[in-house]
Amino acid sequence: MSDSGSYGQSGGEQQSYSTYGNPGSQGYGQASQSYSGYGQTTDSSYGQNYSGYSSYGQSQSGYSQSYGGYENQKQSSYSQQPYNNQGQQQNMESSGSQGGRAPSYDQPDYGQQDSYDQQSGYDQHQGSYDEQSNYDQQHDSYSQNQQSYHSQRENYSHHTQDDRRDVSRYGEDNRGYGGSQGGGRGRGGYDKDGRGPMTGSSGGDRGGFKNFGGHRDYGPRTDADSESDNSDNNTIFVQGLGEGVSTDQVGEFFKQIGIIKTNKKTGKPMINLYTDKDTGKPKGEATVSFDDPPSAKAAIDWFDGKEFHGNIIKVSFATRRPEFMRGGGSGGGRRGRGGYRGRGGFQGRGGDPKSGDWVCPNPSCGNMNFARRNSCNQCNEPRPEDSRPSGGDFRGRGYGGERGYRGRGGRGGDRGGYGGDRSGGGYGGDRSSGGGYSGDRSGGGYGGDRSGGGYGGDRGGGYGGDRGGGYGGDRGGGYGGDRGGYGGDRGGGYGGDRGGYGGDRGGYGGDRGGYGGDRGGYGGDRSRGGYGGDRGGGSGYGGDRSGGYGGDRSGGGYGGDRGGGYGGDRGGYGGKMGGRNDYRNDQRNRPY
């Protein structure tokens, strides 16, 4: 490229200061420099004013021409000398053929101790090599580092906000338990603080749509809802159908675009036509649930604005409206532990649901019904058999029907439950059979596949995960992971297999990891150690059977196979069964 003072040599050759200030574009994204000798201020993309070049800022009293004026002149009178391998042309007119090399006037090679020629015609006092080497050092080590630093800063600035959200995944204030990415909609994730404004899902098929359950009604999505909220939405809201339409007509029309979901209880397609409560006449509105979200998106793209039996229909993603928007109740509702408000809430009636109350299994309705009702008072959907209490004790079934119709999970889920001995479920999850806030062997939890426990109790479950534990208790589960747990004996942890935050055989993550306690550990495979405790033998930060921070016989350390520990009997920094200075030190140099 022409007139380019390029760093094509990746720091091998430095562009020395050009006597005539040609504003060559510098190849590492640096702004082109032009110099004060021609009335142009030095411009640098790094905010540097190369003050060391004060001796180069020639006062060109006799030459007020612009830089372009020099391009048209033969520069033979300037005693240019190409140095070593730079190979610049003497003539700027031919500089276009130099392939990225800059035309340089009296330009020494990188590291060459030459002083510049005194140009009597230009009254230039050129700096010696001392100044030049200082410039080279700055230009080489600082300018390029500046570029890297600024590019990193720019990169970080783009991601800082998102990263902050990710950091709060299990965060102090973030009660989006089980939620991927800080209470998103993964594995039953709730809104960011778990109490969010009516958009959080209560669990479901790994963050499935907020369809099935809760005390809400459907409506069109508002402008405040972002497009990303619909990535798992498989239900559409249709308006303008007309009064004399039937579910069969709606089904025939929309099944052209995808498979309409079937209610497993009734065997009917999941299509709900709305009627006016006062007149009983159809409102011309309906919801249609497809088997998969892409079909719903395709139905919106294709049918929105199309004609249906002589009427132009409007098709959009369905969203639920809270009870107070439908003219409902007092807006009571408790908000503890993320609150019911974010999950479809019960604020319409105020307070907690009573024993025996049940959620309509119709995904287009989701109305909460009194225990005495045998059909939904909104859509007349028959009451599921498994929602009926047995023996006067309704404790074991949670708030929802079979698997909550929340796509493998739900508000209560199969075998759900709020508490008590062997209390069944929890807020969601497939066979989230533990759950409950407390009680002996409280199996389930807020969500996840077969999520074991709950807030506490023996063999307590957890917020999510596979057979996850709970906040405490023997063999407690945890936020996620297999048999995880927050604390207690054999407690699980935030994630991992049999992880745990504390307690006996606890773990923060990993396989049988533990944060502290007996056989605790920070992570790793069977990392039995941890921050302290008796036989804190394995753990450490990671590795297979790696050590731990302290405790008696704390075998481990930061990593490695059966690595040592930070302190305690048989301790050590790392290595295979290693102490700090034992005879196996030759094994410590191998990579972990």
UniProtKB/Swiss-Prot annotation:
Q: Kindly give the CDD domains that the UniProt entry links to this protein.
A: RRM_FUS_TAF15
- Keywords assigned: Acetylation, ADP-ribosylation, Chromosomal rearrangement, Cytoplasm, DNA-binding, Isopeptide bond, Metal-binding, Methylation, Nucleus, Phosphoprotein, Proto-oncogene, Repeat, RNA-binding, Ubl conjugation, Zinc, Zinc-finger
**Which residue stretches does the UniProt record annotate as biased composition, category Basic and acidic residues?**
151-175, 214-224, 579-592
MF terms (GO), sorted A to Z: DNA binding; mRNA 3'-UTR binding; RNA binding; transcription coregulator activity; zinc ion binding
Q: Identify one Gene Ontology CC term for this UniProt entry.
A: cytoplasm
List all Low complexity biased stretches: 1-21, 28-91, 104-129, 140-150
Q: Does the keyword DNA-binding apply?
A: yes
Q: What is its main location?
A: nucleus
Q: Where does the record say this protein resides?
A: Nucleus; Cytoplasm
Q: Which residues carry this modification: Omega-N-methylarginine?
A: R206, R431, R459, R475, R562
PTM note says:
Dimethylated by PRMT1 at Arg-206 to asymmetric dimethylarginine. The methylation may favor nuclear localization and positive regulation of TAF15 transcriptional activity.
Locate the Asymmetric dimethylarginine modifications and list their residues.
R206, R528, R535, R570
Crosslinked positions for Glycyl lysine isopeptide (Lys-Gly) (interchain with G-Cter in SUMO2)? K265, K268
Task: Indicate the segments forming the RRM domain, all copies.
Answer: 234-320
What biological-process terms (Gene Ontology) are attached?
mRNA stabilization; positive regulation of DNA-templated transcription; RNA splicing
Q: Tell me the segments the record calls region 21 X approximate tandem repeats of D-R-[S,G](0,3)-G-G-Y-G-G.
A: 407-575
- Residues annotated as carrying Dimethylated arginine in the record are R483
Linked pathology is: A chromosomal aberration involving TAF15/TAF2N is found in a form of extraskeletal myxoid chondrosarcomas (EMC). Translocation t(9;17)(q22;q11) with NR4A3.
Quaternary structure, from the entry: Belongs to the RNA polymerase II (Pol II) transcriptional multiprotein complex, together with the TATA-binding protein (TBP) and other TBP-associated factors (TAF(II)s). Binds SF1.
Give the family per the record.
Belongs to the RRM TET family.
Please give the function described in this protein's UniProt entry. Answer: RNA and ssDNA-binding protein that may play specific roles during transcription initiation at distinct promoters. Binds to ssRNA containing the consensus sequence 5'-AGGUAA-3'. Can enter the preinitiation complex together with the RNA polymerase II (Pol II).
Listed name of the protein: TATA-binding protein-associated factor 2N
What organism is this sequence from?
Homo sapiens (Human)
Its ancestry begins with: Eukaryota, Metazoa, Chordata, Craniata, Vertebrata
